[in-house]
């Protein structure tokens, strides 16, 4: 079966314990004269979304609309967190309190070691959920799935009411449980405990059969629709009443850091279910995503590009749709192998024989062909409000199917000049009636010792002509 990482129908609502993670990095080479502790000279800092906010970031990285509900203080940390989230187009709908700080965790690191963590928090157990419940009731019917993200900080004190609000409108509720009191999650659609959390509730399991038996009993006891047990290096197991256990082996090639892997799993699960996928497909995609994220350092997200490439068996240095950072790494490896890198760019709105022939000819000029593709906003600025006809994901998916294309990357500017200057191909190619010196990026390539070449398009082949023919047929 052919799976896809394009979630065009999905919209996800997240409610839970939101946090701000702060990191201070510095050098340490002496002990304080005041106490037997190292002195850290802070050189840089970083801020990341944590808790339920990291779940929302994972969903946003899949190009899916997401709304986040939670509790924060009225403080600088809340503003910093909102800025991080809104930069990723996440709709923040926080209940802000004068009485509590925004949950913030400050980590001080030196030489890749965490020396100290400072927590700024006060749990929300004594806070009424009335405002959150009102917001949830107002919003939930507009979304395809609800994630309740529980880190035990008190935001989900009224978790039963939250579950019932969503179930009334037939919205699936997914929860990554906290603690051993799973009864508080009764009637949720799906729980995603890891193996240790699962065994803490049902007891030690000595076989696959025992996991299935105890899991199905838990589903019955809690009136769940499904249970997904994540099992580290053993993969994950989906259990549903009247269905055989669905086991997926781990997709991880190398494990650097499991931080945030649970957030990635539940995010992809909810997104896939909100998009109308089956439980089995949702679990497959979540398993692939988990295999990607544990290969990264720190709390990370998985992009649509990475997920699509992993589904189709593409490696970072192999071929396919890439993010700019991945492309740079792939080009560096290819150049180290002595391969000649060819680069071209365009909108490629409606792929026609002229495009195919041009790309085949460009590929023959070297060992690897990079195609830089204008984003939808970039095309709109260049071609007008009616363009593009096909969105970026569609255009790149079609181009990725051509054997002549090795790597695809998107750019949002009007021209790819910055991208070309970063990549510095051995040969820059453009189709049309240009003079080499007129081609964007030619100066940068020449200064680096590269070449610039103009190729001809086939006569009569153009996207504009294709659009005109379609319009004539409509008339």
From Swiss-Prot:
**InterPro entries given for it?**
Bifunc_HldE, Cyt_trans-like, PfkB_dom, RfaE_dom_I, RfaE_dom_II, Ribokinase-like, Rossmann-like_a/b/a_fold
Taxonomy of origin reads:
Bacteria, Pseudomonadati, Pseudomonadota, Gammaproteobacteria, Pasteurellales
Q: Name one GO biological process term.
A: ADP-L-glycero-beta-D-manno-heptose biosynthetic process
The protein's role, per its UniProt record: Catalyzes the ADP transfer from ATP to D-glycero-beta-D-manno-heptose 1-phosphate, yielding ADP-D-glycero-beta-D-manno-heptose.
Q: Which organism is it from?
A: Histophilus somni (strain 129Pt)
Pathways per UniProt: Nucleotide-sugar biosynthesis; ADP-L-glycero-beta-D-manno-heptose biosynthesis; ADP-L-glycero-beta-D-manno-heptose from D-glycero-beta-D-manno-heptose 7-phosphate: step 1/4; Nucleotide-sugar biosynthesis; ADP-L-glycero-beta-D-manno-heptose biosynthesis; ADP-L-glycero-beta-D-manno-heptose from D-glycero-beta-D-manno-heptose 7-phosphate: step 3/4
Q: So what does this thing catalyse?
A: D-glycero-beta-D-manno-heptose 7-phosphate + ATP = D-glycero-beta-D-manno-heptose 1,7-bisphosphate + ADP + H(+); D-glycero-beta-D-manno-heptose 1-phosphate + ATP + H(+) = ADP-D-glycero-beta-D-manno-heptose + diphosphate
Annotated active site:
263
Instruction: Spell out the subunit comment.
Output: Homodimer.
> What ranges does the record give for the region Ribokinase, renumbered to this chain?
1-317
EC main group: transferase
The question of whether Nucleotide-binding is a record keyword is answered with yes
> What does the UniProt keyword field contain?
ATP-binding, Carbohydrate metabolism, Kinase, Multifunctional enzyme, Nucleotide-binding, Nucleotidyltransferase, Transferase
- Name listed for the protein in its UniProt record: Bifunctional protein HldE
- What family is this? In the N-terminal section; belongs to the carbohydrate kinase PfkB family. In the C-terminal section; belongs to the cytidylyltransferase family.
Region (Cytidylyltransferase) residue spans = 343-475
Task: Tell me which Pfam families the record gives.
Answer: CTP_transf_like, PfkB
What's a single GO MF annotation on this record?
heptose 7-phosphate kinase activity
Give residues annotated as binding ATP: 194-197
EC annotation from Swiss-Prot or TrEMBL: 2.7.1.167, 2.7.7.70
């Amino acid at each position: 079966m052919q799976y896809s990482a394009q979630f065009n129908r999905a919209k996800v609502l997240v409610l839970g314990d939101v946090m701000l993670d702060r990191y201070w990095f510095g050098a340490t080479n002496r002990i304080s004269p005041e106490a037997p502790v190292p002195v850290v000279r802070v050189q840089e800092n970083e801020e990341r979304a944590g808790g339920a906010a990291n779940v929302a970031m994972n969903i946003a990285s899949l190009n899916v609309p997401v709304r986040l509900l939670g509790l924060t203080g009225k403080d600088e940390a809340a503003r910093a967190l909102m800025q991080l989230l809104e930069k990723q187009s996440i709709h923040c709908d926080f209940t802000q309190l004068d009485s509590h700080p925004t949950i913030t965790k400050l980590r001080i690191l030196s030489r890749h070691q965490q020396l100290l963590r400072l927590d700024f928090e006060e749990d929300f157990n004594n806070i009424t959920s009335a405002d959150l419940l009102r917001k949830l009731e107002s919003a939930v019917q507009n979304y395809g799935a609800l994630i309740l993200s529980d880190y035990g900080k008190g935001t989900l004190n009224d978790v039963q009411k939250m579950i019932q609000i969503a179930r009334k409108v037939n919205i699936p509720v997914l929860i990554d449980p906290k603690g051993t009191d799973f009864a508080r999650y009764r009637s949720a659609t799906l729980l995603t405990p890891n193996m240790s959390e699962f065994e803490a509730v049902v007891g030690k399991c000595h076989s696959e059969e025992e996991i299935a038996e105890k899991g199905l009993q838990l589903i019955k006891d809690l009136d769940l629709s499904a249970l997904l047990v994540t099992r580290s290096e053993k993969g994950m197991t989906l259990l549903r009443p009247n269905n055989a256990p669905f086991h997926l082996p781990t997709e991880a090639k190398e494990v650097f850091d499991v931080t945030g892997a649970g957030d990635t799993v539940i995010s992809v699960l909810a997104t896939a279910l909100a998009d109308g996928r089956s439980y089995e497909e949702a679990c497959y995609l979540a398993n692939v995503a988990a295999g990607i994220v544990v290969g990264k350092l720190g709390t990370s997200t998985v992009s649509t590009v990475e997920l699509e490439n992993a589904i189709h068996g593409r490696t970072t240095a192999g071929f396919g749709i890439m993010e700019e950072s991945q492309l740079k790494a792939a080009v560096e490896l290819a150049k180290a192998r002595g391969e000649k890198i060819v680069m071209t760019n365009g909108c490629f709105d409606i792929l026609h024989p002229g495009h195919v022939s041009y790309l085949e000819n460009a590929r023959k000029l070297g060992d690897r062909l990079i195609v830089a593709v204008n984003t939808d906003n970039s095309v709109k600025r260049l071609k007008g409000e009616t363009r593009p006809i096909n969105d970026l994901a569609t255009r790149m998916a079609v181009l990725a199917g051509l054997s002549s294309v090795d790597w695809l990357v998107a750019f949002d500017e009007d021209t790819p000049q910055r991208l070309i200057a970063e990549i510095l191909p051995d040969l820059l190619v453009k189709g049309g009636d240009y003079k080499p010196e007129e081609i964007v990026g030619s100066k940068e390539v020449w200064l680096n010792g590269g070449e610039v070449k103009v190729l001809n398009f086939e006569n009569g082949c153009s996207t504009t002509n294709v659009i005109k023919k379609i319009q004539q047929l409509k008339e």
